[in-house]
């Protein structure tokens, strides 16, 4: 018994040392730096007429003005992450099913909030139920994160008056989200790829962009743009953290990140990469996302798999081709990176959600390294043999305006090897110079009435 205990302790020590070495190596190799003025100047010159006054104090951009502006903007964007987390809390109020039996507040009901006594009554009851749930002694992971957000904002749940204040805050956020959604719809009429440029940056995610990535990679292979075994290093911008996502999410499962492992799975299934040898980095400015991935890596070093609930909400409005294609993707997802496991049962109140689950192998989880980096204003300097074959960003650039998107396009391009690609489901402006050129567009029709189509774009590094 004693020798078994010693062996166990030695194994634990080796695992900790391995994790420390992995983390130290990653930290040394991946230190984000703000873009120098020399790199930003060509982009700034392309937008000279519309630049903020503080960037061109004498009519032209200056290095000193840039250095101050870029750091101020980075701080502002990180504040928008916290605003996005407030939206996650509001989506928990709208769509959660673990703490209430009241109907969910979908977008149709959300638009009526404040104008319909029926919806107002639902919102009031859901808020009472959520506040009551947040005061419970043993909270699940998602609830704990939302309670921590409230405390970070200065709220308490200790007394009845404290709880009244939290209720007022939650309902005010519900009204704000209603107005944000309406404004976003109006902005999308002008440019749908910048529809969220004035709202909090959400970390929520779902599987649908991962299916579009799968289709686009197939298209690239058909066009001869990608060869078998050609992908070794990948970066994902804003991998997301799925917990009550804004469209059809719920709260009966813990927060999880799916895109890194869905991408590895697709690359392996298509023969483009070896899941046990490739490297994948995530670039995110959300501490929730980064800490979540760091914890997954620590647990993987100790031999624990990463469990993902593969949630989907098929719609009767989907075209037959989209429905059959997505379901085939959904049923295969995870076979290259892990194995099926027992899913969390879907509550009756969320019966529109389908679920299956996988355990991702620890060896695959260890291939993922999170980096705290704002790709609009920061980058890492990479030697040629460490540049990326693919950088992927979905549902992220929609939170930025044209100048920010152009800075990101040029910035990301410097981290991609010649012949590599940036993939995104948002068309990026080509007004400013970059070393990325438009390459391929994939159209994915989803519905016909009303017409709805997803797109994926690839940009080739010259």
Q: Where are these predicted regions, by residue range?
A:
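Conserved alpha-helix/loop element of class I SAM-dependent methyltransferases that forms part
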Residues: 207-233, 259-262
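Conserved beta-strand signature within the Rossmann-like core of class I S-adenosyl-L-methionine
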Residues: 418-427
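Class I S-adenosyl-L-methionine-dependent methyltransferase module
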Residues: 35, 39-186, 228, 240-372, ...
């Amino acid at each position: 018994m004693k020798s078994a205990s010693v062996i166990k302790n030695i194994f634990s020590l080796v695992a900790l040392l391995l994790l420390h070495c992995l983390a130290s190596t990653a930290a040394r190799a991946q230190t984000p730096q703000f873009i120098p003025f020399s790199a930003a100047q060509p982009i700034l010159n392309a937008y000279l007429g519309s630049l903020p006054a503080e960037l061109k104090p004498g009519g032209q951009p200056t290095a000193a003005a840039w250095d101050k502006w870029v750091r101020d903007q980075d701080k502002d964007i990180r504040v928008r992450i916290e605003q996005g987390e407030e939206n996650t809390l509001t989506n928990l109020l709208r769509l959660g099913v673990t703490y209430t039996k009241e109907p969910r507040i979908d977008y149709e009901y959300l638009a009526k909030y404040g104008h319909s006594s029926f919806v107002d009554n639902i919102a009031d009851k859901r808020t009472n139920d959520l506040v009551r749930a947040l005061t419970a002694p043993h909270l699940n992971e998602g609830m704990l994160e939302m309670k921590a957000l409230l405390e970070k904002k200065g709220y308490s749940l200790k007394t009845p008056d404290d709880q009244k204040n939290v209720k007022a805050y939650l309902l005010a956020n519900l009204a704000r989200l209603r107005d944000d959604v309406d404004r976003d719809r109006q902005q999308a009429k002008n440019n749908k790829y910048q529809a969220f440029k004035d709202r909090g940056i959400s970390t929520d995610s779902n599987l649908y962009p991962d299916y579009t990535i799968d289709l686009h990679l197939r298209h690239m292979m058909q066009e001869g743009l990608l060869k078998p075994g050609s992908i070794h290093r990948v970066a994902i911008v804003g991998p997301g953290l799925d917990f009550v996502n804004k469209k059809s999410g719920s709260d009966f499962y813990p927060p999880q990140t799916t895109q890194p492992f869905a991408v590895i799975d697709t690359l392996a299934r298509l023969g483009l990469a070896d899941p046990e040898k490739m490297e994948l980095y995530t670039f995110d400015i959300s501490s929730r996302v980064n800490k979540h991935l760091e914890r997954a890596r620590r647990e993987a070093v100790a031999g624990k798999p990463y469990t993902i609930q593969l949630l989907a909400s098929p719609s009767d409005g989907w075209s037959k081709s989209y429905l059959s294609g997505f379901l085939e993707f959904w049923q295969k997802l995870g076979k290259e990176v892990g194995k099926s496991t027992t899913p969390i049962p879907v509550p009756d109140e969320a019966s529109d959600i389908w679920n299956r689950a996988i355990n991702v192998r620890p060896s695959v989880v260890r291939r993922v390294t999170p980096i705290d980096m704002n790709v609009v204003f920061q980058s890492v300097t990479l030697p040629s043999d460490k540049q990326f074959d693919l950088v992927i960003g979905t549902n992220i650039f929609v939170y930025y305006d044209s100048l920010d998107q152009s800075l990101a396009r040029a910035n990301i391009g410097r981290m991609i090897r010649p012949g590599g690609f940036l993939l995104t489901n948002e068309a990026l402006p080509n007004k400013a110079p970059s070393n990325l050129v438009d390459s391929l567009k994939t159209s994915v029709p989803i519905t016909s009435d009303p017409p709805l189509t997803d797109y994926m774009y690839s940009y080739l590094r010259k």
